[in-house]
Amino acid sequence: MVTKGVVVVSSFRRSRQDANRPHAFLTGIHAPVKEERTIEDLAVTGTIPAELSGRYVRIGPNPFRADPRGHHWFVGDGMVHGVCMKGGKALWYRNRYVRSRNLQDAGGPAAAPGPRRSTFDTVNTNVIQHAGRTFALVEAGSFPVELTHDLESFAYSDLGGTLKGPFSAHPHLDPLTGELHAVTYDGQTLDTVWHVVVDREGRVRREEPVPVAHGPSIHDCAITAKYVLILDLPVTFSMAALVGGARFPYRWNPAHRARVGLLPREGTAADVIWCDVDAAYVFHVANAFDNPDGTVTVDLAAYETMFAHGPDGPNGKSLGMERWTVDPAARKVARKTLDAAPQEFHRPDERFFGQPYRFAWSMGLPAENAEDFLGHAPIYGYDLATGQRSAHDFGPGKIPGEFVFIPRRADAEEGDGWLMGYVIDLASETTDLAILDARNLAAPPLALIHIPCRIPPGFHGNWLPDAAD
């Protein structure tokens, strides 16, 4: 258990570290931006599809005080970056800090109102839209933060008093029911994770506890028609790292049993079917679905290890895109490489999430591990029916982040639509919001929305469409 004494020792050890050491996630492309900007009537090269009416909003860490002591990329103060589009125009770009108490204590803007779960209330990992509301999310601690349409106002939310425990940075919408599913964990509770379901109205209807060991870090999950998939893999809470001063105390743990849990969607912990898998780590899944023979397929980005070689950020060897077949009868998982190219941030056409599907897209990673995780690499597209891979390369010095798929229409065929994401230009310290044709990935962008400042690499973004008239 993390006691006040442990926190005091951790703070002391951190204070003894070198405050001037270079930190890959506080310098260069990751250097925090200082100014909150509002830029209207953005310049555009190409044509924004007229059907796009809404906002693209991404969030990531942007430390208000860039102190390398004990710092990890995953714990920086949250900042949202959004672009609003309507009628073929880019109306505005805004970036705003998420108004946490931690930010206020560091000298930043006043904290937002609303309930807190703990003293650490930084939110920096995902932005979603659900039940007509916009939420910024983080895992393992804080409640969600609700944002207004213009990103100008923030309020912490326990979803009307219905969220009793932690939430996730990676809930998934079931397109057939309209509910959000998440697997959540809490750094203060090392023996339990939870399956949380948020209904169509934005209220929690289920928080089902599942016993685990060692406090695993479970960033993502998957669903099928039958199951919720729990990725219980060997990155776990490390008291030694915390006592040593780490702000993100999770490390590779070879003693932790690697397994995938199949939890029936309305089942209890007693119903989980645990299936062993060779040790690996997974941040993100592409999709999962049930097979007629009773097995479950899940496609994902796999790593050989994670957080085994240094405390600053992701540092494991990417194994590319893998397909795992989870066999509840044998209680085993078979692994198959779909593409060994290093990659991350897989996204499907999310109208088909939890169902058999054909298309997925991902962000390439450098062929050699980069100290700051990122580098020149393409956006990949996969046709899983034919095995064909396509790619879009933005050119030297252009660093893309996660790209999200947006269907052309609600009833469009799978994969018929656009990809959207931020691309950093290292030379000019500017950013483009790029819009690509998902079915012709190698073609020039349909539109580049020019943002005259660098948006630091972040985590997750989403297209948040305006409500239909």
Curated annotation (Swiss-Prot):
One of its GO terms (biological process) is carotene catabolic process. Keywords: Dioxygenase, Iron, Metal-binding, Oxidoreductase, Plasmid. Optimum temperature is 45 degrees Celsius. Its cofactor is Fe(2+). InterPro entries: Carotenoid_Oase (IPR004294). Its EC number is 1.13.11.82. Binds 1 Fe(2+) ion per subunit. It is an enzyme of class 1 (oxidoreductase). Optimum pH is 8.0. It catalyses: all-trans-8'-apo-beta-carotenal + O2 = 2,6-dimethyldeca-2,4,6,8-tetraenedial + 13-apo-beta-carotenone. Pfam families: RPE65. Fe cation binds at residues 170, 219, 284, 460. The keyword Coiled coil does not apply. GO terms for molecular function: carotenoid dioxygenase activity; metal ion binding. Changing residue 284 to A: Almost loss of activity. Strong decrease in iron content. Monomer. Catalyzes the conversion of 8'-apo-beta-carotenal to 13-apo-beta-carotenone and C12-dialdehyde. Also has weak activity with 4'-apo-beta-carotenal and gamma-carotene. Belongs to the carotenoid oxygenase family. This is 8'-apo-carotenoid 13,14-cleaving dioxygenase.
